Structures are given as C-alpha cells and as structure tokens.
C-alpha cells in the first residue's frame, strides 16, 4: 500500500475505533493498540516505514506543545519544587532504578544476558516518560482535587523532556559520542538549559505576534510555527528540541492566550491543537500495534513482566521519596496521593516514539521495542482500567457508578419536564381534552416526585462534582446565549460588528469557565 494511502487508512481506522471505544466505554488508546495488533498479525496493512527524523520532527512537537499550552504557570509555580523533584532527580532515579533491576536479573536469562548499562538506561529512559491523558480526563469526571490533577499533568509534561534528554545521552554513549559520566552530566545541563532558553525566546516572540490579532488562521499558523520552529531550531543548534517546545508552549499559553487575544480565536486555536494531538496519538498507537513482532512478544513475556514491575517499583520509589522529602514543609501532599501519582503514571505515545526511533542497525532495537510495547500495554490494561476503583478505594473520588446514576436521574427529570411541557402544548391547542391532560400530568408528576426523592439521596457529597455541575450548566446557558445572538444577526436585527463584539464577550465568559474547571 502506498505511504499516503496507508496514512489515510490509519485515520479512517482511528475514527471508527474512537466511536466504538466511546460506545463500549473502553479507553481509546487500548482499543487502538488492539486493532493495530490485529491488523499487523493478519497482515491486513503494512506499517509505513518510520525514520527517527519523521518520528521526532513530525510527531513530537505537536504532542508536547498541545500539553504545554493548557498548563497554567501559576499552578506550576505553586507546586514548583515537588514537580521539579519528580521531573529531574525523579526521572533520573526512575531510569537508573529500572535499569538496576533489569540488568542483574537479565544476566541469568538467555535473551537478556548481553544487556549492558547503556542499553538498560536507554530502556529505562523510554519508560520513564509518563502519559496520563486518560487518567487526567477521568480525574475531571470524578471530581479529583485540582492540585492532584495539576501535579500529575505538570510532572508528566516536564518529565517527558527529561526522559528524552536521558534517552539521547544514553544513545550517545552507545554510539561512542560520549565516554564518561562527567561528560554526560555536562551534556544534560547544556542541552536542557539552552533548549529552555530557545523555547522561551520563540514563545515570547509568538506571544507578541499574536497579541490583538483578530484572524484565527494567522494565530493557528503562528502557533504551529512556534511548535515546530522551537523544536527544529533547538535541534539544529544541538540542544533539546523537546525542552524548547515545552518552554515555547508554556510561554504562549501564559502570555499569548491572554485577554489581548479574542476569546473565540483562543477557543478555536485550542480546539485545533487538541485535534492535532488526537491525530498524532492515534497514528502512534496504531503504528506501534502494526510494528510489534507478536512472536517475539510471546517469547519475551516473562521479561516484559520483569520490565513492567521494574518500572512500577522505580516509579513508586520516586513518588514516595518525593512525598517524604516535602512532608515536613507546607508543600506536603497526602500520602494517598503517592499511590495515585505512582499508579496513574501510565506509559504511552512518547515511550513508543522513543523505541521506534532507534535505527534498524541497532542490535537491541527489536528487544527494546518489544519490551516498551509490552510495558505500555500492561500499564494501560492493568493501571488504566483499575485507576477508577483505586481512586474510590482511597476515598479521593466518587465512584463512577454514583456519578452515572446521578447523571441519569437528572436526565430523566429533564425528559419528564419536557413531556409535561408537551402535554401543556397539546391541551392549549385543543388536541387533547383537559381531563386527559390532567390524568397524564398527574401520572408524570408522580414519576418526577419519586425521582426527586431519589436524587436527594443520590446527590454525590463531593464539592468538586457539584462545582463541575454548576460550571457545565453555566456553559450550556452561555452557549444558548450564543445561539440566540446568532439568530439575531441572521435575521438582520443586529449588524456584524455588534454580533462579533457580543460573541467575543460570551466566548470570554466560556473560556473563564473552562479555566475554572480545568
């Protein structure tokens, strides 16, 4: 199949899988990987050839930039030291701990006996990058404390950059470009520091350029240039492109998406980046499923389990150590959160990009790809599917069944009130007799009274969920205002200038609500 047709087919498959996964309430990424495995096993579609340049230069920048523009600098600043501890020492320790568990045991296993420290660190860095997108989405749904969500999101974004830098340095050791640990430490701080500097400059220039713009196409173009430009410029200068894109995204999100940018343009731009991230994630998970060697995965399943538990143990050591370090300070967080930070740190797209980016000539490529794929798959299946019960067990969230029951009762109330309105309309139009209307109203009113009693008992006693309900209701009312405003413009009651000014005002209120619920 030609390259272009293969990509088109993958997008069609991703769309179908997304719809199906939503209907059966299955995490989208798990469904994509499963479909990719089936397609690869049946040889229904050959995976397009992926080079390191394609994976790094095309896939990474939008994934990193989209995550960065949604983070608030104030939230990161408030918990900067715990986040920084998880991101730099945490990722380094996690990488080393994973390698330290793998290598000694691997010496006694035929498939892993030749594994050395450089290759072990390469694997450790690949699985140190967390991808908790599905978990954070569930957090919002279940009313998990905002500070825990911020810790999870911020740490994930920033540790991606650290993991990639360590991965690159480990590869430089294997390739012979670095020879001593001292050189590695100097190289680490050089590529990270200069990468952040490049990103700040690109982000600041983009923020200045987008101020007061009223053309959404130009804003989207400029942010696209910022995402790819920050990455490519940094890479050409020999520093970290990922750290550069992280910095550019944070600056654009903080300074570019301020009150100087029209709210409607801001919302459209954010929607564009959410779509791009969705598209890139979809392709990566499908391609990983297509690229995996199932026979090798089957042969290596004990080592995949070893790799998974090594990664999990390393993760819990890091988050527990961070909790202990900050427990005596005002930055402490509950011990229960360490379980969620450890268990919710799923592995995903970035880990697979790093594994796939290794050159075909590298002797351990198939081994690392298989181990990383197995670790990602186990993390999604074991941690991804169990995070909701774990949250409930720890008392951090309301159960999903409670939330659904609450939502269903409210929906039934709405439907019954609509039915009562319909009966009233039929009576006023003399389409049914007053007696029949009264009989029907009495019947439906009894149902409403019964559901109201159930609703009082079922109301989740979680402040965050009630706050979410309020935000959602306000948003719906504001969207109704937008629709009414458009009707006034469409029928000629108001001119375009008035319509645009009032629409921006309403969009500003919607955007403020989105931030309030973020």
Model-inferred region functions:
Residues 1-410, 414-417, 425, 466-470, ...:
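Transmembrane helical cores of multi-pass secondary ion antiporters/exchangers
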Residues 421-490, 496-498:
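Intracellular, membrane-proximal regulatory regions of polytopic membrane proteins
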Residues 398, 444, 448-452, 507-511:
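Short alpha-helix boundary/capping elements
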């Amino acid at each position: 199949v030609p390259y272009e047709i293969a990509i088109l087919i993958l997008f069609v498959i991703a769309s179908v899988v997304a719809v199906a996964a939503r209907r059966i309430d299955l995490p989208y990424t798990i469904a994509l990987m499963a479909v990719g495995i089936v397609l690869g096993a049946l040889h229904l579609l050959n995976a397009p050839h992926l080079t390191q340049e394609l994976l790094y230069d095309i896939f990474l920048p939008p994934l990193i930039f989209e995550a960065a523009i949604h983070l608030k600098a104030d939230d990161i600043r408030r918990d900067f030291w715990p986040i920084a501890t998880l991101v730099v020492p945490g990722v380094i320790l996690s990488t080393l701990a994973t390698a330290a568990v793998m290598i000694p045991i691997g010496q006694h296993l035929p498939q892993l006996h030749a594994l050395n420290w450089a290759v072990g660190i390469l694997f450790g860095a690949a699985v140190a990058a967390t991808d908790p997108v599905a978990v954070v989405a569930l957090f919002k749904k279940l009313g998990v404390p905002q500070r825990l969500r911020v810790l999870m999101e911020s740490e994930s974004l920033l540790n991606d950059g650290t993991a990639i830098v360590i991965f690159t340095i480990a590869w430089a050791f294997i390739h012979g470009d670095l020879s001593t640990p001292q050189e590695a430490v100097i190289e680490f701080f050089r590529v990270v520091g200069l990468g952040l500097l490049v990103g700040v400059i690109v982000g600041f220039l983009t923020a200045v350029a987008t101020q007061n713009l009223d053309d959404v196409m130009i804003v989207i173009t400029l942010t696209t240039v910022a995402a790819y430009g920050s990455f490519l410029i940094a890479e050409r200068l020999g520093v970290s492109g990922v750290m550069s894109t992280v910095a550019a995204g944070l600056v654009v999100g903080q300074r570019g998406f301020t009150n100087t940018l029209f709210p409607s343009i801001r919302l459209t731009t954010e929607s564009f980046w959410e779509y791009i991230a969705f598209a890139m994630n979809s392709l990566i998970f499908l391609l990983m499923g297509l690229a995996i060697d199932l026979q090798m995965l089957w042969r290596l399943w004990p080592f995949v389990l070893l790799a998974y538990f090594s990664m999990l143990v390393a993760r819990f050591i890091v988050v527990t150590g961070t909790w202990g370090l900050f427990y005596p300070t005002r930055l402490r967080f509950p011990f229960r959160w360490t379980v969620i930070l450890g268990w919710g740190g799923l592995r995903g797209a970035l880990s697979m990009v790093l594994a796939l980016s290794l050159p075909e000539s590298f002797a351990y490529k198939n081994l690392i790809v298989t181990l990383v794929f197995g670790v990602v798959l186990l993390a999604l299946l074991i941690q991804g599917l169990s995070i909701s019960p774990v949250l409930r067990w720890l008392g951090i969230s309301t159960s999903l069944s409670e939330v659904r029951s609450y939502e269903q009762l409210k929906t039934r109330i709405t439907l019954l009130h609509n039915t009562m309105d319909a009966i009233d309309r039929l009576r006023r139009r003399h389409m049914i007799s007053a007696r029949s209307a009264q009989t029907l109203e009495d019947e439906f009113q009894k149902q409403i009274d019964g559901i109201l009693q159930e609703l009082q008992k079922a109301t989740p006693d979680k402040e965050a969920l009630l706050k979410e309900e309020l935000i959602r209701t306000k948003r719906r009312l504001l969207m109704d205002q937008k629709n009414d405003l458009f009707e006034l413009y469409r029928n000629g009651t108001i001119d375009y200038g008035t319509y645009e000014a009032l629409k921006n005002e309403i969009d500003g209120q919607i955007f403020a609500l989105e931030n309030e619920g973020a």
